[in-house]
Amino acid sequence: MLTKKDTQSAKEQEKLKAIPLHSFLKYANVFYLSIGMMAYDHKYSQKWKEVLLHWTFIAQMVNLNTVLISELIYVFLAIGKGSNFLEATMNLSFIGFVIVGDFKIWNISRQRKRLTQVVSRLEELHPQGLAQQEPYNIGHHLSGYSRYSKFYFGMHMVLIWTYNLYWAVYYLVCDFWLGMRQFERMLPYYCWVPWDWSTGYSYYFMYISQNIGGQACLSGQLAADMLMCALVTLVVMHFIRLSAHIESHVAGIGSFQHDLEFLQATVAYHQSLIHLCQDINEIFGVSLLSNFVSSSFIICFVGFQMTIGSKIDNLVMLVLFLFCAMVQVFMIATHAQRLVDASEQIGQAVYNHDWFRADLRYRKMLILIIKRAQQPSRLKATMFLNISLVTVSDLLQLSYKFFALLRTMYVN
């Protein structure tokens, strides 16, 4: 009984602990560390760990890009010879996925200094004590973000390892269960190398290399998306807290100076959140654009593969790939929509709070805040695209146009 009570009290104490900022960033950090990368400077990083991560990162990138080049050569040769058209189009889906993953890794490593500044500013805004955190409802925001993240990376891990391990499982079933010693060796992804990879230990080397490359690419993609969504979730949390703080203020019961100080603090807080959104867009804008462009092509090519008739095992993997592409788009669009809604709520909160008895000068100043809040903060894929749930329908329309074109080319 004493042990159970101790366990329960330990759990209760754990719940009562303040939630650090790191809790929002831990999923992204785990995937970045798996490829030997740190997206931003950590406070307590040791020199030997940084050196080890650096060389791990170089090895992972060399392997990933070697696999990418071999896949590209396969596609060029297939198109040039006019053969293996279906395999080439399937490879284009994988190539698009790898190129975007490669680009995201490069983009985040290039923006490390700026990302460190954003995380530092969020750390300064983050309430530290349990009593301070209560009005922010941090536990609710963290649990919501965690659910999205776990489903997101869980689906993609199932996807990548379904592709990676399919032929290994096929080999084990045929060899050890069915006793079929003669069957064609296959790799997870079609590629070209200047030697016969299907004989000897070369096959195992190529298989492991493609598996490691696929996981590295996936880690770069997942980490970038989850890091961006974590930062957006934190900014949304602050917008919601600011709205509640404004609505709870009763103006006019104290001096004008007291109301003016409240307004100054509110405007400074609002401006800091707006600047954070701008920095997030500058860090992730190009990455977001590549996300949506590549997703449209992936949806198109995978949809094409599904309509031309495939084996049941290939069809299952294609459906999984298509589903993951859609999950990625919806997750980013959902967080972008929440940012728009939360930032627009500032103007509504200013209008709703008790300002009727306030000084005329105070009331005039409120108009400026409402006017600024009518221009909501948004996630932007550079200057070309404002992201929201409406963007998803635009993406699906674009994907269908590419699909119709590809289908026509195949029929003709």
UniProtKB/Swiss-Prot annotation:
Keywords carried by this UniProt record: Cell membrane, Membrane, Olfaction, Receptor, Sensory transduction, Transducer, Transmembrane, Transmembrane helix
Extracellular side: 78-84, 174-219, 304-314, 404-412
Membrane-spanning intervals of the chain: 57-77, 85-105, 153-173, 220-240, 283-303, 315-335, 383-403
GO molecular function: ionotropic olfactory receptor activity; odorant binding; olfactory receptor activity
Compartments reported by the entry: Cell membrane
Spans within the Cytoplasmic topological domain: 1-56, 106-152, 241-282, 336-382
Record's bilayer topology term: Multi-pass membrane protein
The keyword Protease appears for this protein: no
One Pfam assignment: 7tm_6
Record has Membrane as a keyword: yes
Gene Ontology cellular-component annotations: cation channel complex; dendrite membrane; plasma membrane
Disulfide bonds: none
Superkingdom assignment: Eukaryota
Tissues with expression: Expressed in olfactory sensory neurons in the maxillary palp.
One Gene Ontology term from the biological process aspect of the record: detection of chemical stimulus involved in sensory perception of smell
Similarity comment: family membership: Belongs to the insect chemoreceptor superfamily. Heteromeric odorant receptor channel (TC 1.A.69) family. Or49a subfamily.
Functional summary from the UniProt entry: Odorant receptor which mediates acceptance or avoidance behavior, depending on its substrates. The odorant receptor repertoire encodes a large collection of odor stimuli that vary widely in identity, intensity, and duration. May form a complex with Orco to form odorant-sensing units, providing sensitive and prolonged odorant signaling and calcium permeability.
Miscellaneous comment: The atypical heteromeric and topological design of the odorant receptors appears to be an insect-specific solution for odor recognition, making the OR/Orco complex an attractive target for the development of highly selective insect repellents to disrupt olfactory-mediated host-seeking behaviors of insect disease vectors. Odor-evoked OR currents are independent of known G-protein-coupled second messenger pathways.
Subunit composition and interactions: Interacts with Orco. Complexes exist early in the endomembrane system in olfactory sensory neurons (OSNs), coupling these complexes to the conserved ciliary trafficking pathway.
Name the UniProt record assigns to this protein: Putative odorant receptor 85d
